A protein has these predicted regions:
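Metal-dependent nuclease catalytic cores that hydrolyze phosphodiester bonds in DNA/RNA
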Residues: 1-165
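Short acidic (Asp/Glu) and glycine-rich catalytic loops that position anionic groups and cofactors
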Residues: 44-49, 179, 231-236
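Generic recognition of stable, solvent-exposed alpha-helical segments in well-folded globular domains
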Residues: 61, 65, 207-210, 257
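Short amphipathic alpha-helical face segments that pack within enzyme cores
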Residues: 65-68, 210-218
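Short loop/turn segments at secondary-structure transitions that flank enzyme active sites
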Residues: 72, 76, 181-183, 229-232
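A structural signal for short, well-ordered beta-strand segments and their strand-loop junctions
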Residues: 146, 169, 173-177, 223-227
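Non-catalytic protein-protein interaction segments used by genome-maintenance enzymes to assemble
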Residues: 151-211
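Metal-dependent nuclease catalytic regions and adjoining charged, substrate-binding loops involved
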Residues: 204, 217-311
Length: 311
């Protein structure tokens, strides 16, 4: 008796079952595809609830603290999910700030150094919020401001769409905001640390431009890429060569090409994570940030897939 051939939908589900603990993958995002494939596999092969339990250092938390507080202070609409949005909430500064800080403090610091940084960053965050709030308001003016709007795009023969959330958006423009958290350094010959402002870039970074390009292709609105720290900001708009339409489109399609390649590799391996791991470059354990502060589950997976033991 001839076995019934699997449908394309079944083949896709089987191949993508390597993600989210067997539950599969609904979509790609810029953040999930901006790193090497090995980094993607040791993160997104785990269930979301496991990923959310992992500890991370203060810098991402600083960005959330600043951006989320500013949004609560000045937004007209904030999307909480793809379909649920809010228009009314308590806009008291201290309450907005404290609620975000409480979310951060639900997780323990990574270590003593991170514990110091998490406390020390608070004064920097207050200053950064002031800078961010002003630059966004000056740019938005009287337009209705929508934050965290979900967007989705799918090109050519892509299997899964790319999704994202826009930081700040009006009828005519959008803003991709990048906070530059303060840096922390160890005091020589002491178990002490100091914190200082991080300088802003003089040119837009390619990874930030690529993320901006995705939102541009989704919205077709005037793009702004803004960097802020606790002292100042720098804005890149379409007057900058790298922010022009042609270059943003180029970066977007480079991202799409990468995703298409990944999808072909995933389909070829038919749900075999070990086989897929051998098709991509092994993790560079000396990379300055991709493989720092790994969870025990991630270290074990790296050893199982590539034979690399974490030191």
């Amino acid at each position: 008796m001839k076995l019934k051939e699997k449908t394309q939908e079944q083949l896709v589900a089987e191949a993508f079952a390597i993600f989210n603990g067997g539950e599969g993958l609904d979509h790609w995002s810029y953040s999930s595809t901006s790193s090497p494939m090995a980094k993607n596999l040791i993160s997104y092969s785990f269930l979301e609830k496991i990923r959310r339990s992992w500890l991370w250092r203060y810098k991402p938390s600083f960005g959330n603290l600043v951006n989320n507080t500013v949004q609560k202070l000045i937004a007209d609409v904030i999307y909480k999910s793809k379909t649920i949005k809010e228009t009314e909430w308590d806009r008291d500064y201290q309450k907005c700030f404290d609620s975000e800080l409480d979310e951060i403090n639900k997780k323990d610091p990574v270590d003593k150094k991170d514990e110091f940084a998490r406390k020390e960053m608070i004064s920097y965050a207050h200053d950064c919020i002031g800078v961010t709030k002003k630059v966004v308001q000056d740019l938005v003016g009287d337009e209705k401001l929508v934050c965290e709007q979900y967007v989705k795009h799918k090109e050519m023969t892509m299997i899964k769409p790319i999704t994202g959330r826009v930081d700040y958006e009006t009828k005519t423009k959008f803003i991709e905001l990048k906070t530059k958290p303060p840096n922390i350094r160890k005091v020589k010959n002491k178990e002490e640390w100091t914190m200082s402002s991080q300088a802003l870039p003089t040119e837009p970074a390619t990874d930030n431009l690529t993320q901006t390009s995705f939102y541009y292709m989704c919205t077709k609105k005037i793009p702004y890429l803004i960097y802020v720290n606790d002292k100042e900001h720098i804005t890149f708009d379409q007057s900058h060569e790298l922010m022009k339409k042609d270059h943003l489109e180029h970066l977007y399609f480079k991202m799409v090409e990468k995703i298409l390649l990944w999808e072909r590799m995933i389909m070829f391996c038919k749900g075999n994570l070990s086989e897929l791991a051998q098709m991509c470059e092994p993790p560079d354990m000396y990379h300055p940030f991709y493989y720092k502060d790994l969870a025990p589950e991630q270290e074990k997976l790296i050893t199982n897939l590539w034979g690399i033991k974490h030191e």
